[in-house]
Structures are given as C-alpha cells and as structure tokens.
C-alpha cells in the first residue's frame, strides 16, 4: 500500500503541482546543507524501513528520550537527502496543562522557488490507548507504527527520491509534533474536550511559520496510510477547502489503477493537522487518511488501541 501512495504522490509533485491556483518558544534553528500518469518507481521496502526505524526508538511522546532521539534521526535523514532543514521548538500546553517540549521539523527542497507544495505528517505518538476494548490498557502508550510513523515513512521516501531528482517546484516536508496529545476518553469529564487540544504543533507552525508570510499552492497530509488494505475516501474538510486538488489526485490514482484504494466517494470530517494549517494560513490542504465507513468513529479497529 505504501508503494501505491508513493507513486501517487510523486505524480502530485511533478504534475498536479505545476498548475497555478499559552506557549513559549525557542528560536528556529536553520541547518543549511554543505501532464502524465506515469510515476517514478519508489521503494516500498525503504518506506517500511523508515517506519520500522521510528518504532525502534520507542514511544515518540514529547518530553521523553525516545522522542528526542527520533527527532534527531528525522533531521539527519532530511539533511542527508539534501533538504534545507529548520527545527522549530516550542513549549506547548497539553489538555491538562502539561508543558510539552515540542519540535516541528521542516525540510525544504528548492528553497528559492516561489511556487511551493506542502507535504506533512505528524511524528509524535499518542500516550494513551483510550479506545482499546480493555480499559486496563487505556493509559498505555501506542507504538504508532500506522498512526504517525507511516505518513512520516512515506514522506521520507519521497524526500529520498527528491534528493536524487529535484522537483520542478519548491517542496516543503513538515513533520508536525504534538498532534496526538488530545484529551483522552477517560478524562473528558475533567478537561476540555474541544478540537484545540489536538494538533498543537501544526497550529503553532500555522501561527509562526518557519518563513514569515509562507505560502504554498496547496498542502497534503498523510495520516494512517500504512495499514493493510487501507482505503481513502474524500474527507469532508479537504473537499470544503481543497476539492480541486482532491479530485485531481483521485483521478490520477484511478488512471494508475489504484481506484480500489482511492474511493470516489465522500467520507466524514476529521480533526487533523490539515484543518489547523487551513485555519491559520489559508493554504488549501487535503487529508489522505484511512477511513472505515462501517466504523462508528470512521477509523479502523486498531485506532488508538
């Protein structure tokens, strides 16, 4: 499945992208580096290896050694692929007031190009398994192989390919932090349960982009793209703000023979990083996220378990 996504997204970079259309912070550190339907060939094994590597660090929860080690790895990989890398650190406040030492990681390809595409995923993991059928597991963390690492793994493989063949436009890959620290089910009677307890890193970046006045033609979020037989419906917020790009990408998928994965039907709305970026920057963004229309919450059974 990852290979299908990577093929599609390489098409997005080289084809669709050619059309016009309480917090305390630390300073951003910049690290400078010393129409067709035929997509380049990507390495699915490489993408899965990036997922496995992230999981090997342990739970990527803010304020933990595993989180820092994984962040260092992501920075080093983007630099290795030739990106101009920015690290945006901030102390963000969790639903219960816990200060989260957070780190958004940005890799820019063709940084001098005015025309830009934004690709993003979250790299943190949820500290709670609050949807597990066994209440004894609700306060246990997730390994985040699908929810977090899969989107990052796909983007790392795209970054590797761009390091070998630069796209014709500017591309910014962002790994957002503190997406998955929202109010858990077991604490909703004590704490605020609004959507602003989620997606803290992306909302912070939207208010404080790594380059003042940053703009992109459009943005694409990858979330939970690694499960077996994952299928992607046209998410509601994506269709509201970025319908043109959703339709183009789904058409490319259909032309490449992936129509059984990219379903030409509307799905529900999801509180996710794309919504925060849209609200804070006005950049039209879409969310490619595994959707189960037969599930009460719209997600597969392994979500937050």
Q: What residues fall within each predicted segment?
A:
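A non-catalytic alpha/beta surface segment that caps or lines the substrate-entry region
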Residues: 52, 59-112
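Solvent-exposed loop/turn segments at secondary-structure junctions
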Residues: 61-62, 91-94, 111-113, 123-127, ...
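Short, low-complexity, disordered segments immediately C-terminal to signal peptides
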Residues: 17-35
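Active-site-adjacent substrate-binding region
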Residues: 89, 99, 218, 225-305
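N-terminal capping segment at the start of a domain
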Residues: 29-70, 81, 296-305
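Acidic/histidine-rich catalytic neighborhood of metal-dependent amide-processing enzymes
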Residues: 139-244
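C-terminal motif of bacterial Sec signal peptides marking the signal peptidase cleavage site
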Residues: 12-15
């Amino acid at each position: 499945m990852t290979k299908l996504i990577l093929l599609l997204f390489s098409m997005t970079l080289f084809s669709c992208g050619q059309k016009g259309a309480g917090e305390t912070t630390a300073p951003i550190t910049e690290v400078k580096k010393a129409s067709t339907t035929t997509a380049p060939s990507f390495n699915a094994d490489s993408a899965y290896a990036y997922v496995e590597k992230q999981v090997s660090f342990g739970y990527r929860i803010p304020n933990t050694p595993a989180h820092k080690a994984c962040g260092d790895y992501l920075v080093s990989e983007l630099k290795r692929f030739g990106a101009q890398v920015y690290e945006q650190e901030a102390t963000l406040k969790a639903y219960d007031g816990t200060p989260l030492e957070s780190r958004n990681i940005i890799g820019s390809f063709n940084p001098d190009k005015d025309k830009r595409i934004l690709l993003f995923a979250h790299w943190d993991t949820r500290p709670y398994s609050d949807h597990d059928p066994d209440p004894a597991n609700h306060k246990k963390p997730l390994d985040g192989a699908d929810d977090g690492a899969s989107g990052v793994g796909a983007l790392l493989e795209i970054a590797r390919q761009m390091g070998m063949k630069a796209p014709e436009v500017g591309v910014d890959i962002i790994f957002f932090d503190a997406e998955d620290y929202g109010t858990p089910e077991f604490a909703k009677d004590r704490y605020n349960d609004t959507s602003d307890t989620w997606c803290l890193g992306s909302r912070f970046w939207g208010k404080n982009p790594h380059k003042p006045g940053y703009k992109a033609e459009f943005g694409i979020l990858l979330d939970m793209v690694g499960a077996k037989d994952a299928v992607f419906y046209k998410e509601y917020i994506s269709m509201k703000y970025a319908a043109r790009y959703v339709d183009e990408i789904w058409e490319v998928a259909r032309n490449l023979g992936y129509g059984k994965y990219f379903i030409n039907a509307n799905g529900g709305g999801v509180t996710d990083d794309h919504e925060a970026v849209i609200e804070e920057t006005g950049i039209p963004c879409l969310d490619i996220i595994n959707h189960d229309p037969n599930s009460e919450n719209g997600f597969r059974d392994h979500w937050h378990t």
